Regions:
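Hydrophobic targeting/anchoring helices
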Residues: 68-177
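Polysaccharide-binding and catalytic clefts of secreted carbohydrate-active enzymes
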Residues: 1-83, 164
């Protein structure tokens, strides 16, 4: 599993009925009017969505991996869940490293520590200076070392070198962004 990249207003069949059962009111009128105008309702929505994603995706995913004799390694960073809880469910919590924000790894390694996980992995050296096309192909070796050292200091102990090594033969262009 790579990353659960999500957007706002995620919905699925039955979400409204289970929401009403759990919270005691109908969410549909608020969704129609714009849930962001109702902070308390938005909080309930996000709480319910987090439970849906955790119970309906992450837990079954981890169980399936384990049933097949595999480990689950997941980046939960964009997940609409309580990421500390979600990271504690997977076998190998994974972060990613960027020179412009190495501190996020602390959340991942903290969750791993609290749930007795031995490995914390990182998709390392991707988007070193921020997202797409910011100094692309201008990474400096010294910066790679700074990032790796910061990741180790923040509790990451398994680096997956991601990016240039995976480009097709004869190409030095990474176009998946």
């Amino acid at each position: 599993m790579y990353v659960f990249n999500s957007t706002q207003k995620i919905w699925t069949n039955g979400f409204d009925s289970t929401f009403k059962k759990y919270f005691g009111y109908d969410i549909l009128p608020y969704m129609i009017q714009g849930i962001d105008s109702f902070p308390e309702v938005r909080y309930d929505y996000m709480t319910h969505l987090g439970k849906y994603v955790t119970e309906g995706f992450y837990k079954p995913y981890v169980e399936k991996c384990n049933d097949l004799g595999a480990w689950s390694r997941v980046q939960c960073l964009a997940s609409p869940t309580d990421v500390m809880t979600t990271y504690s469910l997977v076998d190998i919590p994974e972060t990613e490293s960027m020179l412009n924000n190495p501190n996020y790894s602390r959340i991942v390694s903290s969750s791993a520590c609290l749930s007795s996980k031995r490995l914390v992995s990182s998709e390392t050296f991707t988007c070193m200076y921020g997202f797409p096309h910011t100094y692309l192909h201008e990474e400096q070796t010294a910066d790679l070392k700074i990032v790796a050292d910061a990741m180790f200091a923040h509790g990451v102990n398994h680096h997956v070198y991601h990016g240039m090594p995976y480009n097709p033969i004869g190409s030095d262009t990474n176009t998946f962004f």
